[in-house]
Amino acid sequence: MPVESVTVESVDGVRLDAAVHTTSGPVRGTVLLVHGITVDMDEGGGMFVRLAGQLAAAGFNVVRFSFRGHGNSGGTQRGVTVAGECLDLEAAVQLVEERFRGRFSIVAASFGAVSTVLSLPWLATRLDRLVLWNPVLDLRATFLEPELSWGKENFGPSQQKLLHENGALVVDGEFELGRVLFDEFTHYDPLAGFLDSTVPSLVVHGDRDTAVSYEIAARAAQSRPHTMLHTVVGSDHGFDSREREDEAIAMTVAWLVEQIALSS
């Protein structure tokens, strides 16, 4: 399937790296892929590249992009903020709407769910379906008062001391996050935003996730109308084997194909 590398610009002037996959068959719809924190538009292990290929083969046009401070996009790691990612998502949506007609769907992974869910009030009239992979829905439980081992290791007392003293901490020894982002975590509530929305949704989550709570996501999915939960049994965050990655991809493609058929 043809893949075109493009550049878009957020409203505050940050250049964003993006890719457009155009289906060669009859068009079912368009899907925007929104990656998690510390990775880029390929998503960990290239999952979004493989997902985009399978979606294009199934008749979907696909757009991927890297948030500011990630991949080849402009900005810095330390300058990553929730507000900035919301602006980047807005720019990516504009690219989708410039290239392809009609409503579109979003697949958002991990921290990508935060900007996506917070944007649902203005996305509502544009969005057809929503898929969340291992979504961060509770910022306090993930970052501020971490309940799981990955969060305790990366955002525990010693790391918080570094954040206070130096204005930043380093996640997994390789990605720098600044204090402004952590200040934002006290103000935003993506879980409430997800529960307030009525867009039909699929949540795909591993039940052995050590970074982002499976239980919080599962409860949200089960209490929300028009929402399906698919549990990847035994999987850690990001789907920790090729087999589990393939399961998440296959489930996502099949659900989107089915949903488009139901709505047509």
Task: Walk through the language-model features, giving the residues of each.
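Glycine-rich nucleophile elbow surrounding the catalytic serine of serine-hydrolase chemistry
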Residues: 108-118
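Catalytic nucleophile-loop/oxyanion-hole region of alpha/beta-hydrolase
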Residues: 70-101
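N-terminal cap/lid segment of alpha/beta-hydrolase-fold proteins
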Residues: 1-29
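Short, surface-exposed "cap/lid" segments of acyl-processing enzymes
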Residues: 24-66
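Aromatic pocket-lining residues of Rossmann-like dinucleotide-binding sites
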Residues: 55, 119-120
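The alpha/beta-hydrolase serine catalytic core
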Residues: 5, 16, 114, 125-219, ...
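Alpha/beta-hydrolase fold nucleophile elbow
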Residues: 99-110
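Short beta-to-alpha linker loops that shape the active-site pocket of alpha/beta-hydrolase fold enzymes
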Residues: 37, 61, 66-76, 136, ...
